[in-house]
Amino acid sequence: MKKIVLAALILASMFCNAQETNETRKFEPYVNQLGYNLNESKRFVCYGAEDGTSFKITNTATSKIVFEGEILNNEGWFSDFNPDGIADEFIITADGHGSSVPFLIADHLLETTSSKLAYDFFVDARGFSDLSTYDMAAVYGGGPTRDGGAYGLETIFEILQYASNPALFDNWKSELGDKKVADLIELILWHAEFAYKYVDYNGPVKKRHGTLGYQGQPRMTYDYWNTLDQLAAVCAAYHSFLKPYLDEETYQKYRKACLDNWEAYDRHKVVRFWTYSTKWVDQGFQEFNEMGNAYGQSVFRNLLMYECERHEKDGSPEKFLKWAQAGASDIIKNWDFENPRHMWWIRNAEHITPQALSFFLLLAPEKAPKETKEKLEAWALHMKQKTNNFWKYRTHSESEWAHPKTKELGGAPALGGSMFAVAHLLNDPELRALGWAQTDFVFGVNPVGTHLSNKSDDRVKIGGYWPGVEKGWPQSHPNGFGELGKVRGTLDGSPLDSQFPIAETVETIEGKNEGRVFGKNAYATEGWGISNRGWQATLTFSTLGSHSLKVLDSESTTEISEVKPGQTVNILLKAALNVDRNTKDKGWVLLKTGEQTENIALTETGINTGIFTAKFKIPKNTDVNILELSYGFLGFEQSLTLNVQH
């Protein structure tokens, strides 16, 4: 029965042919083709549906209608629909508009399905694997990530991704073919060694799209500065989770490289007018840009060095904190939401600004400038105003949805992460819902009605595509500078201004890009490492607000904060660890007793519950007064203390 229903759905939701127009075509409901997280915002778009049009949600396994509602302003909402038990597939049918493709609703569906693909991209997209033989003169064809230099900041966001949900990544250690990097920790260490090996490299390389440097000063040919930014993240992570994998001698080499070059490479301050671009989309001097000089990057790097240095006996944390505070104050004073060169114009790097301010409040809230939260509140209000449309898409202006030629991919895929981070800090459920709308946009709730990644046979064969997503981006550019055709998890395209409010026709072009077509048809912008970095950030910050840690009494009836020696308690963690919805998954938390830290294993309470527990007996002979439990690192911690009553 299910196969029949699915076949009917596929036929009902096929792309329209070239002869159809907006006047004749009835657009089907566009849903998040992967599905929706339990207990989070859920919505779809049915373009052209009149207000009041009824819609129904049907369970494809039982053929039963499980939810009903009405469409308003082309949107249908079903946030209150949170089915229990094993995840089933559903479809949405709107009167007169046919049916959607099937989708799931499950615990932490986005994170558990997408997080591995997010770092798999950086495993596959490396320009080389052997650091001893690589020729840096070809950096634009290789580098740590192909089609990019050291400015990609991959290591920073790989480290934040691990810190946000570490037990999830510890379960993924399989390799692909002859790739030498298997898991996220190994990938981080590979990028760290790259950054150290080429910390002072400064060209020459192939010249593309302009030159780098301060306005009025000699031009640089390679972004060597940002190797230090990546090493700073490694040095910070050493003290939280990298010690078992990184020997102290190597760590101290990385730290010394940062300390010796930090001010010489202008890492201590905000850098403006740093590149002169000849690219048609952003010609001229750029105050900030996507190539390693994002507004807010100074906050990230100096906070990470502060975190490193505060653990060292001979450290100098205060100067890095001062520089981080100066960078944050600069953002608070000068970040202009109406200046496109501070916002969408810098495309793939735009997400760094709000995320850097948010990171300050996560990592060291008492040290952040006092106006930090107020600036983020202003940004949140601006975003709500700019997304006041049925796509929930952040528009460019009153007359333009998106760029007429290219938006690259730094908009919706990365914007969700910024919204998640700020919504968590402001306790703003409306902004969090907008963050989920951005992820829906990535998975098909957009004018083209497809995922932003091309579903090629090559990617499917290597496990490089999202399971259950039927319609991928219709065009790919597999053999560009990034050579991303066989790279897992690549994002390939994003709607142009001409595709809004709806794409009239969508032409599928397999395996090639016949130039960049700026008309009505969708086109592939060509994936890029920096684009996927923003998507990685969204998956990182989405965990804020959905993870929780509690300790209950032995009967699991009451939450407690005081315990006695010899008492048995239940530790309860809710986190994005429910990878296999047919078995009980595993997790862990850290228990700190005085100077000792141990790992406590957790098991899911049942199949597909997403809640992980363990019974723990307080040692009878303990003489400490406080036990500390935590999950996560670097500001992403869920933590609590237990007072031991002797």
Where are these regions (language model features)?
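Aromatic/hydrophobic beta-strand junction motif of beta-rich domains
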Residues: 43-48, 569-577
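Extended ligand-binding groove/face enriched in aromatic
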Residues: 112-329, 333-343
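A short beta-turn/strand-edge loop motif at beta-sheet boundaries
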Residues: 37, 50, 560-563, 577-585
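Aromatic sugar-binding surface patches on proteins
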Residues: 72-81, 604-623
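Short, compositionally biased P/S/T/A/G/V-rich stretches that sit at domain boundaries
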Residues: 23-34, 546-564
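Hydrophobic h-region of N-terminal signal peptides that target proteins for export
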Residues: 9-17
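Low-complexity, Pro/Ser/Thr- and charge-rich linker/hinge segments at domain boundaries
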Residues: 21-27, 39, 100-131, 646
